[in-house]
């Protein structure tokens, strides 16, 4: 699997993004079929105590927070790096990763094996709950909607937005509308600008926003645009995103 993310594409070249992503996902599929021993579940001892905030409980305001993550090229492993360091009772997370139909279920299952939180491919009507991560299904848009004092997701076959379905902009804009200041947006490695405008909407509504830095990105595209338009509150390395997120949640 070592060749999957080895080379960073030249963004100055004319690239058929869909072809590139499909090739990437095919490699991920091949890698996932390799006979590599993987623990059924990560042991809590494997996560640094500092990353877990000393196992102290989150406050009520934290549990009312919606965490949204958006990523593209290189994002499958980057998102794993963030999620695996979060404790099992972390507030609900929604993720849009650019992936073709048929791959997101497999990806969610892999994350579920490797993370403390429960991870599943999202279905319309799924509630955003403590300890659970919902992955946008391939070839579907995913929005967050408010249902009373709770949040759920709506997955639908709409038009492509920012050239993508699922689109990070669709997710982030819906979180801005539904949760406003009670949300966190994280934009990670990826080509293009999908998610930048949606993250700016979140920030304008009072959300805390995090961008992955250039050094740790496979492609510093989406986070770069978000940073340049003022959508990012703090920009950090992929390995530090979980710590920054937890520090924010414990402060609520």
Give residue ranges: language-model regions:
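Short, small-residue-biased leader/transition segments that mark boundaries at the very start
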Residues: 1-5
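Conserved acid/base catalytic micro-environments in cytosolic active-site loops
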Residues: 6-252
């Amino acid at each position: 699997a070592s060749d999957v993310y080895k080379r960073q594409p030249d963004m100055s070249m004319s690239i058929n993004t869909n072809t590139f992503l499909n090739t990437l996902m095919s490699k991920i599929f091949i890698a996932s079929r390799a006979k590599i021993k993987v623990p059924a579940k990560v042991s809590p001892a494997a996560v640094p105590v500092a990353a877990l905030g000393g196992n102290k409980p989150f406050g009520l305001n934290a549990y009312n927070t919606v965490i949204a993550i958006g990523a593209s090229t290189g994002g499958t492993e980057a998102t794993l790096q963030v999620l695996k360091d979060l404790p099992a009772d972390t507030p609900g997370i929604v993720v849009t990763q650019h992936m073709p139909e048929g791959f997101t279920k497999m990806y969610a299952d892999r994350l579920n094996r490797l993370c403390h939180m429960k991870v599943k491919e999202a279905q319309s009507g799924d509630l955003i709950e403590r300890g659970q991560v919902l992955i946008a299904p391939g070839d579907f848009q995913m929005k967050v909607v408010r249902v009373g004092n709770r949040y759920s997701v709506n997955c639908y076959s709409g038009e492509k937005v920012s050239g993508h379905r699922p689109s990070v902009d669709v997710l982030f804009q819906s979180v801005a509308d539904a949760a406003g200041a009670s949300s966190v947006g994280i934009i990670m490695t990826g080509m293009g600008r999908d998610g930048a405008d949606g993250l700016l909407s979140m920030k304008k509504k009072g959300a805390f926003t995090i961008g992955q830095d250039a050094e740790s990105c496979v492609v510093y595209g989406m986070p770069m645009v978000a940073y340049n338009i003022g959508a990012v509150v703090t920009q950090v390395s992929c390995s530090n995103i979980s710590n920054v997120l937890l520090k924010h949640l414990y402060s609520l």
